[in-house]
Amino acid sequence: MTMYAKNNTAGKDMLSLLEWNKEELTDIIKLAVAMKTNPAHYSHILSGKILGMIFDKPSTRTRVSFEAGILQLGGQAIVMSSKELQIGRGEPIKDTAHVMSEYIDAIMIRTFSHEKVEELAYHAEIPIINGLTDLHHPCQALADLMTIYEWKDQLEGVKLAYIGDGNNVCHSLLLAGAMVGIDICLAMPKGYEVDETILAKAENLAKQSGGKIFVTEDPKLAVTDADFIYTDVWTSMGQEDENAKRLADFGEKYQVNAELVSGAKPDYHFLHCLPAHREEEVTAEIIDGNHSVIYQQAGNRLHAQKALLAAILEAK
């Protein structure tokens, strides 16, 4: 089976999803589903490949899913932090990128500044995967799309409501959804909107795909007839000093609770990228309830990233 070679995606970076088109993204999702269904078929396709993983931020899902993923495809992983590399002592990113390109086949980096990832990709001769930055979290968006596809057997025309902070997760979800034709409703208070440049790019993608984007401060309006309701923490890593203000600004109005979800479709599903703060952005009743698919969603990080690795590393 050569499904992973359908598009010429070998060597491509995954920085913000904008490097990819709708067909390529859809193929990644379908390949991920195939890998989940029949993992043994793909167990040696990346034999001899080495993935370097650099972490500047703590990680559970990103680290374990990428490390397990490359191993399950027959490859290997080397896990590092910037503190363990010369880059942590002032070596230019340019030098690190060129040297790492001599040793390994791809780099996944989880860091703070998106500019750092872009600079690494500019100088590297190997694919760079963004494992999370302050602006984007594309690998999470791949898992989100896969989860939606598994439940609906399609992406176009699905209605998704995102309630909360216009953060990196929201940015990538917005771009991915717009690219594949999902109707996205965003609800967030003033001061927590998505980046204007990213929103403009998403709106352009939606015009091409037939998707719709609607932005409001009213979460009840956003969830009306929604197929999926998505939220994330109100305070991300590095924003701990703002926690009290953020809790006050979001308040009960933006909490995903029984009253809010009553406006969605009866068979709606709840999504959260995790980790979650129960009784803040979502009640335990909802996140632990029958409509929640958060563990399936988290599990799909593994399969979506395996498909991504196969696509960019010239799988055998």
Curated annotation (Swiss-Prot):
Gene that specifies this protein: argF
Origin species: Listeria monocytogenes serotype 4b (strain F2365)
Record family assignment: Belongs to the aspartate/ornithine carbamoyltransferase superfamily. OTCase family.
Catalytic activity: carbamoyl phosphate + L-ornithine = L-citrulline + phosphate + H(+)
Signal peptide per UniProt: none
Taxonomy, superkingdom: Bacteria
UniProt-listed SUPFAM superfamilies: Aspartate/ornithine carbamoyltransferase
Protein known as: Ornithine carbamoyltransferase
GO terms (BP aspect): arginine biosynthetic process via ornithine; citrulline biosynthetic process; L-arginine biosynthetic process
Binding-site positions, L-ornithine: N168, D232, S236, M237
GO function terms (MF aspect): amino acid binding; ornithine carbamoyltransferase activity
Annotated binding of carbamoyl phosphate, by residue: S59, T60, R61, T62, Q86, R110, H137, P138, C139, Q140, C273, L274, R301
NCBIfam families for the chain: orni_carb_tr, PRK00779.1
Pathway involvement of the protein, from the record: Amino-acid biosynthesis; L-arginine biosynthesis; L-arginine from L-ornithine and carbamoyl phosphate: step 1/3
Chief subcellular location: cytoplasm
UniProtKB keywords: Amino-acid biosynthesis, Arginine biosynthesis, Cytoplasm, Transferase
Keyword Transferase assigned: yes
Classification via PROSITE patterns: CARBAMOYLTRANSFERASE (PS00097)
Catalytic activity, EC: 2.1.3.3
Cellular location(s): Cytoplasm
Job of this protein: Reversibly catalyzes the transfer of the carbamoyl group from carbamoyl phosphate (CP) to the N(epsilon) atom of ornithine (ORN) to produce L-citrulline.
One GO cellular component term noted in the UniProt record for this chain: cytoplasm
Enzyme class: transferase
